């Protein structure tokens, strides 16, 4: 049995949060779905959380955030707000997300560096792109406005010779057989969401 989550109130704590789509459906292979998620993520940012980093994968997301009130409320707004918009704007009728989410409280600058590098490397590890900077749906590409980390948590990201963020210790560093761009990465033969609007 999973222990009860400690309530994360407005205490200035930063979290690494992960949530999966329902049945691991690859909704975010579709540009309209991915852009709607990013719009929702940034729509709640001013009032619900500081956003320090993110990556949107075909069937899950990771975010580094400091909630303004509580972590639960921030994620409820993000996931619930996106579900509402997907039903209204994309005509989706089913579940979008699994219930709940996983979180990890960031302890210090090194912990922040590890999780920031994980965000950057996730699309590379999944062979969606060869370099983190080439992935359209990640803060690692430098195209998105982010909030500063709280004092003492600013990570020192080290880039390797290819310009990719240094991998966290628990990641696979295999760089073989990568796809070269998002377009080819998001084309799947077994696409559950193929009939989506």
Where do the language-model regions lie?
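Short catalytic/metal-binding and nucleic-acid-binding patches
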Residues: 1-197
């Amino acid at each position: 049995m999973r222990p009860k989550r400690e309530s994360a109130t407005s205490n200035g704590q930063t979290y690494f949060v992960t949530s999966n789509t329902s049945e691991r459906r690859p909704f975010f292979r579709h540009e309209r779905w991915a852009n709607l998620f990013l719009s929702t993520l940034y729509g709640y940012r001013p009032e619900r959380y500081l956003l320090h980093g993110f990556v949107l994968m075909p069937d899950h997301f990771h975010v580094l955030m400091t909630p303004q009130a509580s972590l639960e409320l921030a994620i409820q707004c993000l996931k619930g707000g996106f579900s509402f918009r997907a039903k209204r704007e994309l005509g989706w009728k089913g579940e979008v997300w699994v219930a709940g989410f996983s979180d990890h409280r960031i302890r210090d600058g090194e912990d922040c560096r590890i999780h920031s590098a994980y965000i950057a490397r996730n699309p590379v590890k999944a062979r969606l792109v060869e370099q983190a900077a080439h992935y359209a749906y990640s803060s690692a590409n430098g195209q998105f406005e982010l909030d500063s980390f709280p004092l003492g948590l600013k990570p020192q990201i080290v880039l390797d010779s290819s310009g990719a963020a240094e991998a966290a210790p628990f990641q696979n560093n295999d760089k073989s057989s990568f796809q070269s761009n998002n377009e080819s990465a998001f084309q799947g033969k077994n696409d559950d969401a193929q009939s989506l609007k």
